[in-house]
Amino acid sequence: MQVNETLAEGLRHEFQVSIPAAEIAAKADERLDDLKDKVKINGFRPGKVPVSHLKKLYGRSVMVETIEDTIRDTNMQIVNDRGLKLAGNPKVTMPSEPKEIEDILAGNSDLSYSVAIEVVPPIELADFKSFTIEKPVVDVSDADVDEAVERIAEQNRTYTTRAEGAKAENGDRITISFKGTIDGELFEGGSSEDILVVLGSNALIPGFEEQLVGAGVGETRTVKASFPGNYADSELAGKDAEFETTVSLIEAPEELKIDDEFAKLLGLEELDQLRQVVREQLSAEFARAMRQHVKRALFDRLDETHKFDAPPTLVEEEFEQVWKTIMAEMEKEKKTFADENTTEEEARAEYRRIADRRVRLSLVLSEIGEKNGITVADDEINRALISRARQTPGREKEIWDYYQRNPQALAQIRAPLFENKVVDFILELATITEKSVTREDLFKEHEAHSAEM
């Protein structure tokens, strides 16, 4: 076998490979010899089929398989012998002339091909003991608990039908049907039947609910309102509309009583238990947000201290995946780049930067895990998979089987487990400082930087 490197430019390497025809033929004969013990052919006893006869029947397909396996094994040998780390699958170029291919398959010519590979650059890891990471700290206050309990109570508020002839007031729940028009024409999504609206909740576009205060059951009003300039559907944003709206039911809110009886309606023993459950839920919610903040701060430090050229192919793949998601969201919400105060060119540049960062961080985390023996055990993956399957009651086995059949999907279960293990490893070495922040600041920061995680 001859291997000549024809290009070594940055992270790209190309090789010209030549493997003697005799070597390929010997491997193919080994396959055929192994095959004779497995196939059943009329007129021959098991294991007694002559190789020459097998070659007539299966010679071409066996040669194709032999060549494919030889190319794969040779490419891995090239990579391993040079201490390289692949960034993606090798790209093989075979001879273009049909006669050359036929000669190789017939065993009359050496197997010659070229292979291009892209590699991961050497990564020199930072001293994680020098890292200082700030952790925001938010304690669950009694006011937070009160607010959450009141929200739960509001969601479970009961209503009673108002007396005949009553007029709708703020706070009432009304049932309405409407047909919306713009410039006299019906528009998509502008009509609805029998929807519940609490007057004053601002669930509908600005100005809509106010015009129904004072309406009675059976009354139809023409509601004039404008869609906000930042409305999700850009085709409706900023436009004036009219809605022929009919009220079919008016219900008055009953008094909210947040007491032991209310807690029992929710399946709990008393109000104190409800408050404790809410406090624990808020604590878990805050902890997740604080964890995300710490991870982002850590990733920022890893980004700052590990500057290298990421493999272009990996960056392009990550960018295409991100961009596809962005475009799908924009199409769904009928938004344009102008709606986001940017241009497509600027957006592409920003998301390509994010893709480059994600790829570099992924490679750094992988290097840290490899050098420090950080792994994810099968039972950890299985527990995560069971948890995922339980999110779709009744389809647990279907979900489980899907992941077992799809290694790439299973890798998506493993990835966050591995990432969290590496993050915990670094945080054990780093210095963590705490800073008290408000709940609002914690979640505002979390939302602002979620795209780069």
UniProtKB/Swiss-Prot annotation:
Subcellular location, record wording: Cytoplasm
GO molecular function, one term: ribosome binding
Keyword field: Cell cycle, Cell division, Chaperone, Cytoplasm, Isomerase, Rotamase
Listed EC numbers: 5.2.1.8
Reactions accelerated catalytically: [protein]-peptidylproline (omega=180) = [protein]-peptidylproline (omega=0)
Gene3D superfamilies, per database record: 3.10.50.40, Trigger factor ribosome-binding domain (3.30.70.1050), Trigger factor, C-terminal domain (1.10.3120.10)
UniProt enzyme class: isomerase
Transmembrane region(s): none
Main location class: cytoplasm
Pfam families: FKBP_C (PF00254), Trigger_C (PF05698), Trigger_N (PF05697)
Signal peptide positions on this chain: none
Residue stretches making up the PPIase FKBP-type domain: 171-256
A single GO cellular-component term on record: cytoplasm
One biological process term in Gene Ontology: 'de novo' cotranslational protein folding
Protein function: Involved in protein export. Acts as a chaperone by maintaining the newly synthesized protein in an open conformation. Functions as a peptidyl-prolyl cis-trans isomerase.
Domain commentary: Consists of 3 domains; the N-terminus binds the ribosome, the middle domain has PPIase activity, while the C-terminus has intrinsic chaperone activity on its own.
Family: Belongs to the FKBP-type PPIase family. Tig subfamily.
Name of the protein in its database record: Trigger factor
